Curated annotation (Swiss-Prot):
CDD domains: WD40
Record's protein name: Guanine nucleotide-binding protein subunit beta-1
Role description: Guanine nucleotide-binding proteins (G proteins) are involved as a modulator or transducer in various transmembrane signaling systems. The beta and gamma chains are required for the GTPase activity, for replacement of GDP by GTP, and for G protein-effector interaction.
Originating gene: Gbeta13F
Keywords from the UniProt entry: Phosphoprotein, Repeat, Transducer, WD repeat
Homology family: Belongs to the WD repeat G protein beta family.
Chain positions of WD repeats: 53-92, 95-134, 141-179, 182-221, 224-263, 268-307, 310-340
SMART domains per record: WD40 (SM00320)
Amino acid sequence: MNELDSLRQEAESLKNAIRDARKAACDTSLLQAATSLEPIGRIQMRTRRTLRGHLAKIYAMHWGNDSRNLVSASQDGKLIVWDSHTTNKVHAIPLRSSWVMTCAYAPSGSYVACGGLDNMCSIYNLKTREGNVRVSRELPGHGGYLSCCRFLDDNQIVTSSGDMSCGLWDIETGLQVTSFLGHTGDVMALSLAPQCKTFVSGACDASAKLWDIREGVCKQTFPGHESDINAVTFFPNGQAFATGSDDATCRLFDIRADQELAMYSHDNIICGITSVAFSKSGRLLLAGYDDFNCNVWDTMKAERSGILAGHDNRVSCLGVTENGMAVATGSWDSFLRVWN
């Protein structure tokens, strides 16, 4: 037996030891713990606003911290900032590349970012002295498409890419400060922890990873999915996160327990998940699907509590407002819908 085989064997035995330790510590399940909880009943939401203006598939959206404005990115080559109360377009920004896959709103409300098949993250300043929106910085450096980006603040942004890495960038200098390496497939999504000290990523290697932003290292890896992970989102308290995958399941992972707590699936659901978001309390998990619907899951009981049906094509993105009062869905049908 050569050295490589013996190392493989050693790695397997270590993995099994970790599995056994997890099992030993797992004295209850989420479903058992949730038996005494009152069921939440049927969740019925209505479309309160329809945002019309994009001329092609919408690929991404992100709410601003004011819970009023949101940014969306479409294949029509436009980034639109909307006022969701009035449905007015605050800004319509023409992009240099129409192959956009992600967009993000800075916490301050002063900047938006986007990127895609141009392999870079473009930052736009919404609050210039002249009143026009312009590119304030382009961040090239990834060797593959940009799948997701999220601002830490006005000068730092985290990106994920098809080059199997994530990156932390200094916007002022335009340089990548940290590269987060470890995934063995395209990284499709990321979610920042509420305290912004860590983030979680989901990738085509069917695993999710938790990263320490300051140390630049992977702290934990969460296997379990059987296909690409397309979406991740932190639980509101930062102690857990949910994933959505092409294997037609969403899953809840607990960081402290270092394992999967629940799986959200249904025999009738056979298509992939594109996007996930929690309600403000975390009791509801909203997930967008390839079958044009958005399913609402009871996080604790792992049961479906409702369906948001209204789009005529794939639901590609969704987001819950900071104040928890509304959810927006974006679709390949070119419309955004705001529900509550």
